[in-house]
Amino acid sequence: MSDNFNALVINQEGEKFSREIKKIDKSFLKHGDVLVKVDYSTLNFKDALILKNGARLVKEFPHIPGIDFAGTVVESKSDKFKEGDEIIQTGWRVGEIFYGGYSQYAKVEANFLVKKPKEITSRQAMMLGTAGLTAIQCAFTAKQTREVLLLSLIHI
């Protein structure tokens, strides 16, 4: 891995809010024990709020948004993951408090990650997003004899 990579960085100085794709250094990623090469991310409603003006969800600037991402483990200090593991990250306030997935690389706590099911690709995982992944996890764990009701609410 090169020490420099691209990330969408938001910043707020006084009343001035900015978004910019920047070349940053690996040392910029200050949280976590697992480094992931991000393959895909999503644009969630919460991401849109954060990208507009921080939405009072982001407390420290500069910041990398992106609440969901899927990718491949590059480095790990955790016993839970090893180099080459394909992972999914959703929730845990990543993209709000912790740096998120709008970056070529992300560094997060191992507890925030799950191994990607082999039945789906990283792209498919991010096409589903947080709500879809929750539903699919339920479907994978439901017994064949059980009925599962999936509801969807779309706000336009």
What are these model-predicted stretches?
Residues 154-156:
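Conserved small/polar residues in nucleotide/adenosyl-binding loops
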Residues 46-51:
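Cytochrome P450 core scaffold surrounding the K-helix E-X-X-R motif
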Residues 25-43, 54-94, 120:
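Glycine-rich beta-strand-centered segment in the early N-terminal region that forms part
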Residues 15-21, 54-55:
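Short gly/ser/thr-rich secondary-structure transition/capping motifs
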Residues 3-8, 34:
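Short structural boundary motif marking the start of a folded domain
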Residues 19-21, 26, 70-72, 105-107, ...:
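Conserved hydrophobic/aromatic beta-strand scaffold that supports enzyme active sites
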Residues 90-150:
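NAD(P)H dinucleotide-binding glycine-rich loop of Rossmann-like/cofactor-binding domains
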